[in-house]
Curated annotation (Swiss-Prot):
Residues 32-497 form the Topo IIA-type catalytic domain. It comes from Streptococcus pyogenes serotype M1. The gene is gyrA. Heterotetramer, composed of two GyrA and two GyrB chains. In the heterotetramer, GyrA contains the active site tyrosine that forms a transient covalent intermediate with DNA, while GyrB binds cofactors and catalyzes ATP hydrolysis. A motif (GyrA-box) lies at residues 524-530. This is DNA gyrase subunit A. Few gyrases are as efficient as E.coli at forming negative supercoils. Not all organisms have 2 type II topoisomerases; in organisms with a single type II topoisomerase this enzyme also has to decatenate newly replicated chromosomes. The lineage of its organism: Bacteria, Bacillati, Bacillota, Bacilli, Lactobacillales. One of its GO terms (biological process) is DNA topological change.
Length: 828
């Protein structure tokens, strides 16, 4: 026999129907706030239940368990824990901009500590919470049956201030979520008033009075474009940043002090995260982290190592930790029973409509009540005017029913009026009492006329709303806590996280590049043996060495006449003896393409200037720097080369500089670059020097008469010669002798102009570096041998050199601890 209690259904259809019912229940009745009062059902039921229980600000606190039990039993049958958690949140200053519950006991902390059990804590409504329920007994809102029909509960609260804006809302429903930030009470009220006074105002105009969120924990909002987008569309994102200060201790060390955290950030988790980053060496320079917060406020201290930069560490903290977070707007709320993403204007419009309805319903309630009372008083006045006859009717009637009927018939009274006459005490028959009744009646008639006028004039309703909100603003508003920073959010670029310091960039002949701290090499006297400066093998040597800063942009010009770009910090740091990283791992070089020149291109130093190119075959070209602003990842053509030619040198010039070019066989030519017009990137250039047989260009430099020309030969000889010994001539000549080339000193390794104060770093093909001051190199004439500046091992040759800033110390000091630690980290 078939069981009549079993019903055959289609599983697919049942799943769809049941899930939709469940989803709508969660969306409408659990997770999302109503746009009118800004409350989810659980919060509304808690506040209404507390009000009905009499747990108001003027009464003592009541046990939380009693409140949650009452709310659960009457209105919210979903478990006491969810009710208690919602009530606890309404009592936390770091969660609500204006707390709706006044908690007594342990209600948690912004460190993530939970509240004590509900049997231990007590609560009552806060004063401002009463404003949400004010006039609820005047038929201002609709009521509905509770879950079992035994009680009545409000569908929405009167909400005499815009709670959805003031306290915001968060919630996750089925397939949707809401995230509305809190705002300043005064600003929210001013925004509502602006819309009432200027219905055609724009979002930009609204932002003049409500510029952005005001979080209970304060902090900084970085930029305003995200706010405008969110206010305009209901969706957007802003960056929240902790309020920090960098203090200097009496010992000269720096510390970072955090006094305000972004909204919703757990302070303890931030503490743990910073410690973990320091332990994992992902964030260096931090020596201690302490939470010194107290009743006086938040104070979170991060101690910095003496040699570290607090600014760089702080930027790293912003990038790696919750000291900087994003807040995503998703202003989803229930509007007319339907979930909808709302703009700021729509939220305010809905609130104004709700307040108009509340005022109209309250006014009607007061008017009906006044009319009912006036009706009674009118009957009493009739009775007092005919007192003897009324007394006679009552005395001669056998029952009160007969008396009431007679009074109604004789004086044309209603049932309520006649009953009021019968209920009237004898004391009210005095003349004084009649005057009181008449006065009350007259006052009621005036009140009824005023209430009728309110209902007839919408502008009076608007005025009442504004006046009552102004009173709330006067009583409860407080200053803004969150500071809105002017300008857009600056995304943290990599260089914001890198401490700016002087470094050396070396590039070996086989293409290994690395970055070293410049202070690893200190000046030696002329003739010193030098220290091992690179980790090249016997068959490799350093070709390029440049002194720069970690934040500078480096342009890499290749033998193919192409140019690439890198930030100095993008080049990995290695120890002195480490080999480095193959340059092909950083730049997309073609087969056979090698770096010939690295030039430092600081923006402030390149504006309006040109690049001066010199090739191995003596061809020169001048091109404006601005043509190299946008260098692709795969490089850019810098100049067109003739077959067999290579680019060997690039200079940054003003357009009016004198240029000197030196050749391998010891000749040089000086000319003014103005004789060469600016050319495009694809141009080949013109002849700069006419080379002798088997000769080639080894260097080019800008030159002024107050400078000196420094030349160094392959066998370690060098000399300085006054620039005045090099006359300016036209380009394209064979040049004049600049050094006496012999087997002893070898051919020219390079040429550069100096002022005599610089340090020079000389590199051999064995990877040995010596640093010495230019002043230690003798001054001699043009066609001389020079002096020995570096003792070379057998088969060693000088391949290149570069100028660096001078140092006071003359003793070579190598920080081996730092070298070893860096080498081990990189090699591993």
């Amino acid at each position: 026999m078939q069981d009549r209690n079993l019903i055959d259904v289609n599983l697919t259809s049942e799943m769809k129907t049941s899930f939709i019912d469940y989803a709508m229940s969660v969306i409408v009745a659990r997770a999302l706030p109503d746009v009118r009062d800004g409350l989810k059902p659980v919060h509304r039921r808690i506040l209404y239940g507390m009000n009905e229980l009499g747990v108001t600000p003027d009464k003592p606190h009541k046990k939380s368990a009693r409140i949650t039990g009452d709310v659960m039993g009457k209105y919210h049958p979903h478990g006491d824990s969810s009710i208690y958690e919602a009530m606890v949140r309404m009592a936390q200053w770091w969660s609500y901009r204006h707390m709706l519950v006044d908690g007594h006991g342990n209600f948690g902390s912004m460190d993530g500590d939970g509240a004590a059990a509900q049997r231990y804590t007590e609560a009552r409504m806060s004063k401002i919470a009463l404003e949400l329920l004010r006039d609820i007994n005047k038929n201002t809102v609709n009521f509905q049956d509770n879950y079992d029909g035994s009680e009545r509960e409000p569908v929405v609260l009167p909400a005499r201030f815009p709670n959805l804006l003031v306290n915001g809302a968060t919630g996750i429903a089925v397939g949707m979520a809401t995230n509305i930030p809190p705002h300043n009470l005064a600003e929210s009220i001013d925004a509502v008033k602006m819309v009432m006074e200027h219905p055609d105002c724009t979002t930009r105009e609204l932002m003049e009075v409500i510029p952005g969120p005001d979080f209970p924990t304060g902090a900084l909002v970085m930029g305003r474009s995200g706010i405008h987008r969110a206010y305009d569309t209901g969706k957007g994102s802003i960056v929240l940043r902790s309020r920090t200060e960098i203090e200097t201790t009496q010992t000269g060390r720096e510390r970072i002090v955090v006094t305000e955290f972004p909204y919703g950030v757990n302070k303890t988790k931030v503490h743990e995260h910073i410690v973990r980053l320091a332990q994992e060496k992902r964030l260096e320079g931090i020596t201690a982290v302490r939470d010194e917060s107290s009743r006086e406020g938040v104070r979170f201290v991060i101690e910095i190592r003496r040699e570290a930069s607090a600014t760089v560490i702080l930027n790293n903290l912003f990038k790696l930790t919750s000291l900087q977070t994003n807040f995503s707007f998703n202003m989803l709320a229930i509007e007319n029973g339907v979930p909808k993403i709302l703009s700021l204007r729509q939220i305010i419009d809905n609130y104004i409509s709700h307040q108009k309805e509340v005022i109209i319903r309250r006014t009607r309630f007061d008017k009906d009540k006044a009319e009912a009372r006036a009706h009674i008083l009118e009957g009493l006045l009739i009775a007092l005017d005919h007192l003897d006859e009324v007394i006679a009717i009552i005395r001669n009637s056998e029952t009160d029913v007969i008396a009431q009927t007679e009074l109604m018939s004789r004086f044309d009274l209603s049932e309520r009026q006649s009953q009021a006459i019968l209920d009237m005490r004898l004391r009210r028959l005095t003349g004084l009492e009649r005057d009181k009744i008449q006065s009350e009646y007259d006052d009621l008639l005036a009140l009824i006329a005023d209430l009728s006028d309110i209902l007839a004039k919408p502008e009076r309703i608007i005025t009442i709303i504004k006046e009552e909100m102004d009173e709330i603003k006067r009583k409860y508003a407080n200053p803004r806590r969150t500071e809105l920073m002017v300008g857009e959010v600056l995304s943290l670029e990599d260089e914001d996280l890198i401490e700016e310091e002087d470094v050396l960039i070396t590039l070996s002949n086989k293409g290994y590049i690395k970055r070293l701290a410049q202070d690893e090499f200190r000046a030696q006297k002329r003739g010193g043996r030098g220290v091992q400066g690179t980790g090249v093998n016997n068959d490799d040597f350093v070709r390029e060495l440049i002194s720069t800063s970690t934040h500078d942009t480096l342009l890499f010009f290749t033998n193919f006449g192409r140019v690439y770009r890198l930030k100095a910090y993008e080049i990995p740091e290695y120890g002195r003896t480490a080999k480095g990283l193959p340059i092909v791992n950083l730049l997309k070089l073609e087969d056979g393409e090698t770096i010939q020149t690295i030039i430092n291109a600081r923006k402030e130093e390149t504006a309006g200037k040109s690049f001066f190119f010199t090739t191995k075959q003596g061809i020169v070209k001048r091109t404006e720097v601005s043509e190299f602003n946008n260098i692709r990842q795969n490089g850019l053509r810098a100049l067109k080369l003739k077959e067999g030619d290579q680019l060997i040198n690039v200079l940054l010039t003003s357009g009016q500089d004198d240029i000197i070019i030196g050749t391998h066989s010891g000749y040089s030519v000086r000319f003014n670059e103005a004789s060469i017009r600016n050319m495009g990137r694809s141009a080949t250039g013109v002849r700069g020097v006419k080379l002798r047989e088997d000769d080639r260009v080894v260097g080019a430099s800008r030159i002024q008469d107050n400078q000196e020309v420094l030349v160094i030969t392959e066998n370690g000889f060098g000399k300085r010669t006054s620039a005045t010994d090099y006359p300016t001539k036209g380009r394209g000549g064979k040049g004049i002798k600049t050094a006496n080339i012999t087997p002893k000193n070898g051919q020219l390794a390079g040429l550069v102009t100096v002022d005599g104060t610089e340090d020079i770093m000389v590199i051999t093909n064995k990877g040995v570096i010596i640093r010495t001051n230019v002043a230690n190199i003798s001054q001699t004439g043009r066609a001389t041998l020079g002096v020995k500046i570096m003792k070379l091992d057998a088969d060693a040759k000088i391949v290149t050199f570069t100028l660096v800033q001078p140092e006071d110390s003359s003793i070579a000091e190598i920080n081996t601890d730092r070298e070893n630690s860096i080498s081990k980290n990189k090699d591993n």
